Each structure stands twice: as C-alpha cells, then as structure tokens.
Amino acid sequence: MPTLQSLAVPFGCVQGYAPGGIPAYSNKHESYFSGERSIDGNLFCGFKYQCVEFARRWLFERKSLVLPDVDWAVHIFNLKEVSDARTGKPVRCVAIRNGTAAKPVVDSLLIYPSDDYSPVGHVAAITEVGDKWVRIADQNHRFHKWDANYAAELPLIHEKGVWTILDPLEDEVLKPLGWVTFPDTPDRNPNEPLVLHESLHFKRGELPTLRRLTFTPTSREKDWLDLTNEAEAYFADVCGIDVKNPKLEKASYYQMNRELYLDCAKYGNQLHQMFLEATKFVLGSDELLRLFCIPEEYWPRLRHSWETQPHAITGRFDFAFDEDTQQFKCFEYNADSASTLLECGVIQQKWARSVGLDDGTTYSSGSLVSSRLQLAWEMAEVTGRVHFLIDNDDEEHYTALYVMQHASAAGLETKLCVLFDEFHFDENGVVVDSDGVAVTTVWKTWMWETAIADHQKARVQRGNDWRPTPKDEVRLCDILLGPNWDLRVFEPMWKIIPSNKAILPIIYNKHPDHPALLRASYELTVELQRTGYVRKPIVGRVGRNVTVTEASGDIAAKSDGDFSDRDMVYQELFRLPERDGYYAILGGWVIGDVYCGTGVREDKTIITGLESPFSALRVYQGAQRRPLTHEDLDKAEAAAVGGGLKT
C-alpha cells in the first residue's frame, strides 16, 4: 500500500488550482523549509512553499489586497487591517472565532492555532461554504494532487446556533481558531490587471552577518546539563565540564542574523539536492565512478544501495561566510557523518541558557535538530531492532546515545554496540547479537571505506573458501558487507559518493554559476594557481592531509594525517575571515531531507580539525515570537468582559 509520503507531490510542483486559477505548490512535507523567498513581480509572498506564501498570493489575486508581514501564520488572526494593492492604503479586516453564531464566509482566511508540534499555526483560504462543509485551498498542510479546485472539504457542524469547522487530519482532528474576513472588499475582476502600489514593493532588508561576540556572564546556572540523560552525562564526563561550577568567566559565542540563517537553509537545501543528483549521475557511469577509487567489486552493491535505500538520517556541510565580501561558500559535504550533532542540537542551547543568552531575542541555531532527528527516524520506514555500531571513541559514544534517544522516541528498539564483541555467527552463519536478534538495521559511525578495507583484509586472512561458524569472530565487514545486501544501514552505502571529494569537480562543472560553489578540479589548473587553491584527499576526515596554497605560491597552511596516499582534488581557495584571532567553519546539518541546523567550529589556524572546539551559535530574531491558542483567545475575551464590567 502506498504511504502518504510516497503519494506526496514533489517540492515546487503544482498540487492544484484554487478558484480563479491560483496555483498551490507542494512544500514536500510540513517540516520542510526551503529558505527561498517567493517574489511575484514586486510582491514578497513569503517562503517557498509555506502556507503564508499561498495565502498572500491568493489574497492579492482574489481581492487585490496585500497581507502584511507576520511572524507566524497564526498571527494573521490578530490583524485589524491589510493593504489595498492598488493604493497602498489600509483596508479593514475582521477576525471571527470558530465555534460562534457566525457562519463561515467564502473568500476569507481560515486560521489554525499554535500547538506543541507547530507553534506557527496554519492558514488556508475558504473557497466554498455549504451547510455541512467548507472547502479550503492551502499549502504545506496536505501534499496530495488535488482532485478538484480545493485541497480538502472540512466538516462544518451547526449545533445550538453555533457553527464549528473541524479538520480531520490523519490521526487527529484540528479545530481552527477562526477566519479573517474582508467585508469592505469585493472580489477582484479577473479581467483587470494586477497592480501593486510602489509602497508595497519588496525591499531587501539587512545584509547577512556573522559575528564573534565576547562577554562576561552576570550569572551562571549550576546544573546546566541533565545528568539523568545518558548522552548529556557522557558528554559532561568526556569534556570535563563541571556542571556545579558557578564561576563567572569571559565567554565567547557566535551570532548570525536572520538573513544568514536563511542563506544557510536555502543553500543547504539546494546543495543537498545537487549532491544527490550528482550521486545518481556518478552511479550511472563506470567512467565517473572509477574516479572515486572504490574497488569495482563493490559497485553492484553500491548501486543496489542507491536503488533500494533512499532514506538517510544525517549529513553535514562545511560552509564559510565572509561578511565583508558577502560571499557564502561550500567546502564539502560530510554526508556520512554525525560528528558534533549533540553539540549542535543540545549542548549549545543549554550552555547559552546557563549564561543568560537565552533572553528571547536570539535562539539556538540548532533548535530544530532534535525534533527533526526523531522525524527522520519516523520517516525512515524502519522496523525491528536498530544496532548502533561505534568504535571505542568517546565522541562517537555520546553522539550515538543522542541519536539512539530519538530513534527510541520514534518507537524503535535500539541497542548500542561498541566494537564487535556483542555479535556472533549463529549456526546458519547469520550475524546475531547477544540476545540472538539478527542484525537487520544498523546505524554506524564507521566509515564505509574502513569497512571495505576490512573486507579485503579479511579475505586475505580467511581465504576465499571461508564460511562463517559460531566460533568465528565477527568483524566490521561481516555486518556491513555480509551476504545480506538488503541490510538497512544509516548512513547507506551510497553516501560514499557525496562524501568523497571526487564529487566536487562534478558538482562544480554541472553548476558553475551557483554562488555557493567553489571551482574544483582533478588537476591543478592555471586558473586555480591564479586564485590560490586547497589540495585535499578525495577520502579524508577532520581536515587531515590538506594543503592551502596562496596565489603567490606560498603555502599558507598544511596538515598531516593518514590519507596522504589517496588521490587528490584541487579546490579554489576561499580565505576564511579572521574574527578575534579565530577562523570559523559553519557546520550545516541536513537531517532526513531538510536543512535544519547550524553549528560552528573555530580554530586559530585556517584548517579546522578534530581538536577544533565547537562554539555556540545564536540566531538574532529581535522581539520574541509568542504562540496563539484557543486558550489565549478565551483569556483575552474573559479579560475584556471583566474590564467592561469594572467600568
């Protein structure tokens, strides 16, 4: 049976047309945020393809009205006026509560409340009203192809003189707050041209910024980590954090503004799709695949992985941003990595709160990571036990505990396995754990290249005729590269391709004008010599075996490591700006299929590595956003009645 996810219209494709021929576009799923502005002529509609984007386009085309900027969709219910698109003058609008004597009105906006899952609420257009139903058109709520000129027909209940709209959505029934009407404004004549007054034209706001800020906290929470949480407790033990220490010392953190946050999301989502497209391109060509130096015997299994295991959990881009030049660049995609995930999703927010930075004007750049991590597991279509395979490494340990926590929250059974003593072969040669449970799904921190090397080494040591018996020790390759090609692995084997830097010249050649890409080549070209270049191994980690050469030919930096025997690629030099003596790399997280968080690693050298410290990153938002619920409206109405009685 096809799932709702499999039936979803792809991002950016038309789901249907509302009355008047107004298109509604798919946002893919409700947790996806593209970071891309939608501008229709000179009208800023919103972000592709959120619910407000459709509502603003619909109101403009249907009534020649312009919805003002709102923080969240739910805040439309608080509006008292909108703008006449032709004159720019204010036009009255009226909010009517759901569940009152007023019957819903055609061509009004239906507003949904904040809830725990979606504090921003939702907005839809009411396109038709019957006695027992209303029909709505919207985006980012349902994702199917429309059968008619509306997205859904919702029940309208009329009891004891009260009209109530309900929205049965999958396994829950939502009750909208109410609807916003435009009583003084008839529908626009479709034969008349759309006109937008100059005062309503979109104007680009502030430029993107990234600052390193230093301050001395005025207070400090004593117990800022939760030592009852396994991941946080392990992190505290490893990093030597004294959570009882109230000492106030000078501290530093990074702060980006909303424009840079939007650039991270926009470029992160775009680049993720580019890397996926390039991966498909590479896997379809033996000539290109050979550039990745993967032994040919593994190619069929690699292609099988791509064809049968589309789901992924995490990947991290390395980004850089120069505020002076306003350039934003991607260095590479660590598509098979979860390193610094706990720091981004939990630690930086709890540290910020402990030193008083969480004052409502900023929020953590990793605030969505935990919820999206759980969602990624829910969407991965996994059943049974998930074995978490890690090396005997502290960072891998607390990272695995964090990811396990959210896999468990998604309803999965999990088991942490350090090295391979946990496993043995049963009588049939199947790898099972100490409970006798066969390994069918794995999350791992091991590099796929390590598994391939182990597989080749094992063949030499065991011989070609070896068959597993219960007395044999289980190795990494027996799990990841055993006879079961349908073993679910996160990250899947095909992630070798986007993680390999041999993909960088392919990406650049396919998208040479993309503003976030750097020129890359398999050979040192005259152009790269002119700009300066970075030489790095196609397979490597944490900045090892990297050489940075200036345009003058001088070597600016060089790192050692274990990857010097690998093939190399050459990438255009992008000079990291110095901030207070430090150089910062932005780690941009794609979780599931959506960009959702950013972290910072900084160093006093221009090559960041394993020992480069993680620093907190805050996003400046200005005034704090507040949810709006039925309870909030009830309290406001009660207060208004009470105030009236007192007078």
UniProtKB/Swiss-Prot annotation:
Changing L487M: In strain: Silvio X10/7. Changing K635N: In strain: Silvio X10/7. Changing R535K: In allele TRS-2 and strain Silvio X10/7. One of its GO terms (molecular function) is metal ion binding. It catalyses: spermidine + glutathione + ATP = glutathionylspermidine + ADP + phosphate + H(+); glutathionylspermidine + glutathione + ATP = trypanothione + ADP + phosphate + H(+). Changing V106A: In allele TRS-2. Mg(2+) 1 binds at D318, E332. Changing S365C: In allele TRS-2. Monomer. In the C-terminal section; belongs to the glutathionylspermidine synthase preATP-grasp family. This is Trypanothione synthetase. It comes from Trypanosoma cruzi (strain CL Brener). The lineage of its organism: Eukaryota, Discoba, Euglenozoa, Kinetoplastea, Metakinetoplastina.
